[in-house]
Amino acid sequence: MEQFEAINVEQAYSRWKDGSAALVDIRDPQSFEAGHTPGAFHLTNASLQTFMQQNDFERPVMVMCYHGNSSRSAAQYLLHQGFDAVYSIDGGFEAWARQYPQDVETSA
């Protein structure tokens, strides 16, 4: 995969539920703490190396942001770091929380 692929929240939810892809959330710390998908890795500049060390580059990665815009550049960046398949979630966390409110947790 040379270019990331955009997927909708239904596709992302299915992959998240069956565990076939890693989920990273690139929103700011306050937004992440206020609500995020269970098991999502909070990916920041500071946590990037940890994520890369802990994850198999052959396992698909889904990138979530606020609305599905910022995730596109982050997805492309992860591809350039060597991940085989990276997906940007259209609609981002806002769409996820609207469609799957039961699958949102807080850090508080």
Swiss-Prot record:
The residues forming a coiled coil are: none
The active site of this protein is located at: 65 (cysteine persulfide intermediate)
Per the record, the GO terms for biological process are: glycerol metabolic process
Which GO CC annotations does the UniProt entry carry? cytoplasm
Q: What is the predominant subcellular site recorded for this chain?
A: cytoplasm
Gene symbol here is glpE
EC number(s) from the headed UniProt entry:
2.8.1.1
Please give the name of this protein: Thiosulfate sulfurtransferase GlpE
Q: Which NCBIfam families match?
A: PRK00162.1
Q: Write down the CDD domains for this protein, in alphabetical order.
A: GlpE_ST
